[in-house]
């Protein structure tokens, strides 16, 4: 099993012990719901703290990245690190959304609606097998995701020297096309997440993996929301 989401790996589900409680679909849904509620709660807190938006965003971004790395390497502690990640990412998203809302009214609501709408559509496509998660599809999505991650990393380094990658962040058609591609890629990563989770359940993954699965889905949803914010801001910036 492979996934474009870096927190979902083949080795992740290989630690179930005979006779131990195992991962279930209901458990994954419940744990994911808890993480989403925690994320939304901290989102709302950051939203209503405009005077400290930047510190909250920095704490959420750095803290969330560190916690995500720890969770990837030590999945068994995901019942603790998963909620921590959700809270930290809520601070990041809430602060960023509030800042963008000041420039583009209702952009946060639009991005949230599109995020959950995309989740519902991709889940339907997966469940009905309209799109089948083949090895070829997995390989293509993984390669494209790695390429985007590398591109963003290079852009980050260039920004430190006062430069940047031209066009992709502009409000022109190249920039909008790039954002559409990345949004689509994030959406297709949801398919890989669903596939990996389904296989984890079939293989009898340990119970704590319900939290890890919820954490993994949240990682993809956060990425999708951020990319939708970026896309909507480009479209609104053309007005």
What is each of the regions a protein language model found here?
Residues 1-239:
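A hydrophobic alpha-helical transmembrane-helix feature that marks the membrane cores
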């Amino acid at each position: 099993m492979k996934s474009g989401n870096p927190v979902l790996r083949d080795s992740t589900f290989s630690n179930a012990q005979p006779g131990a409680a195992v991962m279930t679909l209901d458990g994954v849904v419940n744990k994911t719901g808890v993480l989403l509620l925690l994320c939304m709660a901290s989102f709302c807190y950051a939203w209503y703290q405009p005077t400290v938006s930047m510190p909250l965003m920095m704490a959420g971004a750095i803290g969330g990245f560190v916690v995500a790395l720890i969770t990837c390497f030590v999945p068994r502690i995901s019942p603790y690190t998963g909620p921590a990640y959700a809270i930290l990412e809520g601070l990041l998203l809430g602060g960023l959304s509030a800042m963008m809302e000041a420039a583009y009214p209702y952009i946060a609501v639009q991005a949230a609606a599109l995020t959950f709408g995309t989740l519902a559509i991709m889940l339907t496509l997966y469940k009905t097998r309209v799109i089948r998660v083949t090895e070829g599809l997995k390989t293509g999505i993984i390669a494209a995701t790695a390429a985007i991650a590398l591109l963003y990393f290079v852009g980050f380094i260039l920004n430190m020297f006062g430069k940047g990658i031209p066009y992709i962040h502009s409000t022109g058609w190249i920039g909008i096309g790039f954002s559409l591609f990345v949004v689509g890629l994030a959406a297709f990563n949801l398919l890989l997440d669903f596939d990996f989770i389904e296989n984890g359940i079939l293989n009898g993954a340990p119970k704590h993996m319900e939290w890890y699965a919820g954490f993994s889905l949240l990682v993809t949803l956060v990425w999708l929301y951020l990319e939708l914010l970026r896309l909507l801001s480009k479209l609104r910036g053309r007005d």
